[in-house]
Amino acid sequence: MAEFPSKVSTRTSSPAQGVGASVSAMRPDLGFVRSALGVLALLQLVLGLLVWALIADTPYHLYPAYGWVMFVAVFLWLVTIVFFIIYLFQLHMKLYMVPWPLVLLVFFVAATVLYITAFVACAAAVDLTSLRGSRPYNQRSAASFFACLVMIAYGLSAFFSFQAWRGVGSNAATSQMAGGYS
């Protein structure tokens, strides 16, 4: 029968070391905020907030067109917040199995199309649902204007995401690992 060893070497580690490493990885990437994609995301968040806040301050529930505008504005605003946080804290680097440039491209193209429909619905319904010069008229007109600006911002993001997905101006593998923002 085999002898049991008289000495056993063991190693211990502090659990605080592992926690500190994950906290330091959660630092915000200020380079993303300064990039074209980061600036456009901030613009989309601010302008999208203006769109749904202006519509929400009117009796929008009486008109189906504004229900659609509210759905598009709030839904895309929330999804943009999620993507902004993912890129700001570099969580896309930890989720490397997700093709982030393609995901962003699909999202931004879909967001552009949805905001085109929301802008058209909002702009077309202003005269039909409000008296010219009234407070709801002015708010809905302003919401239409900001919806147009958000639509343009999402379109620009789709263009930049397409370039990142194609790898224009850089190695495609480097673009994937760098998060695809310039």
Curated annotation (Swiss-Prot):
Phosphoserine: modified positions: S9
Post-translational modification summary for this protein: Phosphorylated.
Region (Disordered): 1-20
Biased composition (Polar residues): 7-16
Alphabetized UniProt keyword annotations: Cell membrane, Membrane, Phosphoprotein, Transmembrane, Transmembrane helix
Transmembrane segments: 36-56, 69-89, 100-120, 142-162
Disulphide-bridged cysteine pairs: none
Chief location: membrane
GO cellular component entries: apical plasma membrane; compact myelin; membrane; membrane raft; myelin sheath; plasma membrane
Tissue spec. comment: Detected to the sciatic nerve, brain and kidney. In the sciatic nerve, found in Schwann cells; in the brain, in developing oligodendrocytes, especially of the corpus callosum, of cortical white matter, in the optic nerve and in the stratum radiatum and stratum oriens of the hippocampus. In kidney, segregated to the apical surface of renal tubular epithelia.
GO molecular function, a single term: structural constituent of myelin sheath
PANTHER family: MARVEL-CONTAINING POTENTIAL LIPID RAFT-ASSOCIATED PROTEIN (PTHR22776), PLASMOLIPIN (PTHR22776:SF9)
Family of the protein in this entry: Belongs to the MAL family.
Record text on subunit structure and interactions: Forms oligomers.
Protein name per UniProt: Plasmolipin
Classification of source organism: Eukaryota, Metazoa, Chordata, Craniata, Vertebrata
